[in-house]
Structure formats: structure tokens, C-alpha cells
């Protein structure tokens, strides 16, 4: 049964069925990829868009909520056509072992292969949002990162894991660290110098705030780009002094990352946090 390929071996059959067949949300109906006509249509439609728009990567939303074997077959259609294209799956789960289950090439006990070259590290995001606000102890503060990276053995290709501070579904990182510039810079530094590769959400480069109470990313429009905007944060003159400080810091680290091959494919080494200092290379 394809239901058995849902990640939890202890889940009830009804839970597996609801996860696979139920709608993701009340206003987001699921498409039945087991229908061969729909499967072919979606495959052809995506290939058309890749060719038309010269797409160089795909993010598969809410991957585990699909019939994951059919989803794997669907992803494979793109990998057959574009073997060098990176395809990242949004697998929003709560442990590195669960995330690694969904990266292609993993030696899963049930034999499942997602065909996803890349997955998103939601657990690292959780640690980034929490660690800089906590006092150091066995399980909190900077030791969070040491424990997290110690589980990298679970990934078939840890260099192709996507790291991020925030996105459209979660609190802004600026909210998590209460706009503390030093904490914010530590988050940016870790994002751009750790194993894997970074995703930067629009506005993160200027410490953009969110709208309190909006559960989806606390979204503000990026200031600028339209005639009616009061200022243009795409320019130095249109940014505040604090925004320019964050922007310049982010740009400098991005240029450093671009010019440093070890950050692309080197082996990460970390040292146990001690006296408020966490060191890795």
C-alpha cells in the first residue's frame, strides 16, 4: 500500500489516509496525482514553464501531504528531462531524521526515494529563532546548533540542504530576535557560512519587520519599486542607517561566501560551545 510509505511506521491507517487524501487547508483543494491524465497534464505544464521562463530550480510545496510515491514519480519526470536542475522539497517536519527521509538517495527502511535532490532545514530555522534569546545550558542557547549539526550524518547530501532564517509562512527573523542588531547579524552570519546553501527571503537583507498577528510570514511589502511608495529601499538613500548597516553586512558576507570554495563544498567541523562561544569551520 502506498499509505505505508508515509514516514511514521506507528501511525494509524486512518491518519495515513487523512494525510494523503485530505485537503491541506479548507481553501486549498488537493489535486489527485494518482489520476494519470492529471499527472500527465501537471508534468507537461511544468516542463512548458521551465522551457518558457528558463526556470533553473523548483520548490515543491508541502511535499509530505501528497501521495508521496506519486509525488516522487512526478519529481522524477523533471529530473529525467533536466538532470542538473535543483528541486527542493518543503518538508516541514520536526527532526533532522525526518527531513533526511525526504532527501533522494537516503537508505530508508521502507525503500522510499523522494527523488528530491534538496530539502529545507526547518529544524535549523527553529534553533536560529530561539538560540540567541536563551541562556546557555545543555539543551538551550548555542548548544542547540552543536546538537543539530551532529545529526548531519542522516543526510545523503548535506551540502544540498537549504537553510533559511524566515519565509512567507513564519515569523520574520527580526521578530524572533526583537530587532536586536547584534543577534540579527549572528543569524545572518550563520546562514551564510554554515553547511548547505542559503535562501534569503525578500526584506531579510534590511531587517524588514512583519505585521503582528499575521500568521503567514508577517508580510509587509518591500518599500520601493512603485511610484506611490514613500521611499525606495532598493537604494542606499532610501534605506535607514540601520537598514544600510544590515544590508552592507549581508552583502559583504554574500561576497565572501561567493569567493570561498570551502563554504560551497568543504567539510564542516564544529567545537562544543564553551563560555558563550560556539566555533565552527
Q: What do the predicted segments below correspond to?
A:
Residues 45-47, 51-156, 161, 179-180, ...:
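Active-site-proximal helices and loops of the catalytic beta/alpha 8
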Residues 267-277:
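Short, solvent-exposed loop/turn elements at beta->coil junctions and helix N-caps
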Residues 182-186:
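Conserved interdomain hinge at the start of the Helicase C-terminal
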Residues 60, 168, 203-205:
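Active-site glycine-centered loops adjacent to acidic/histidine catalytic or metal-binding residues
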Residues 188-209:
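Substrate-binding cleft of secreted/luminal carbohydrate-active enzymes
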Residues 1-53, 71-82, 97-98, 115:
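Substrate-binding/active-site clefts of carbohydrate-active enzymes
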Residues 88-89, 196-203, 261-267:
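Acidic/polar loop patches that form or flank catalytic/metal-binding clefts of enzymes
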Residues 19-34, 52-54, 164-174, 227-237:
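Short glycine/proline-rich turn/loop motifs
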Amino acid at each position: 500500500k502506498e499509505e505505508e510509505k508515509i514516514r511514521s511506521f506507528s501511525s494509524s491507517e486512518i491518519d495515513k489516509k487523512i494525510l494523503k487524501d485530505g485537503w491541506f487547508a479548507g481553501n486549498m483543494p488537493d489535486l489527485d496525482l494518482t489520476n494519470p491524465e492529471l499527472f500527465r497534464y501537471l508534468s507537461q505544464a511544468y516542463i512548458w514553464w521551465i522551457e518558457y521562463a528558463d526556470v533553473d530550480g523548483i520548490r515543491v510545496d508541502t511535499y509530505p501531504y501528497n501521495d508521496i510515491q506519486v509525488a516522487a514519480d512526478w519529481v522524477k519526470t523533471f529530473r529525467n528531462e533536466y538532470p542538473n536542475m535543483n528541486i527542493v522539497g518543503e518538508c516541514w517536519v520536526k527532526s533532522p531524521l525526518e527531513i533526511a527521509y525526504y532527501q533522494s538517495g537516503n537508505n530508508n527502511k521502507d525503500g522510499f526515494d523522494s527523488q528530491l535532490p534538496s530539502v529545507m532545514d526547518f529544524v535549523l530555522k527553529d534553533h536560529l529563532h530561539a538560540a540567541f534569546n536563551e541562556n546557555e545550558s545543555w539543551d538551550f542557547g548555542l548548544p542547540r546548533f552543536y546538537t543539530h549539526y551532529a545529526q548531519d550524518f542522516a543526510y545523503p547530501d548535506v551540502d544540498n540542504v537549504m537553510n533559511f532564517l524566515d519565509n512567507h509562512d513564519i515569523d520574520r527573523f527580526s521578530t524572533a530576535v526583537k530587532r536586536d542588531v547584534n543577534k540579527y547579524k549572528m543569524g545572518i552570519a550563520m546562514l551564510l557560512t554554515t553547511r548547505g546553501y542559503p535562501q534569503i527571503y525578500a526584506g531579510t537583507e534590511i531587517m524588514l519587520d512583519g505585521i503582528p498577528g499575521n500568521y503567514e510570514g508577517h508580510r509587509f511589502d518591500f518599500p520601493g519599486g512603485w511610484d506611490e511608495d514613500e521611499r525606495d529601499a532598493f537604494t542606499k538613500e532610501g534605506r535607514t542607517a540601520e537598514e544600510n548597516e544590515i544590508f552592507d553586512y549581508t552583502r559583504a558576507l554574500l561576497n565572501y561566501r561567493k569567493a570561498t570554495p570551502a563554504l560551497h563544498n568543504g567539510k564542516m567541523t564544529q567545537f562544543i560551545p564553551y563560555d558563550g562561544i560556539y566555533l565552527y569551520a
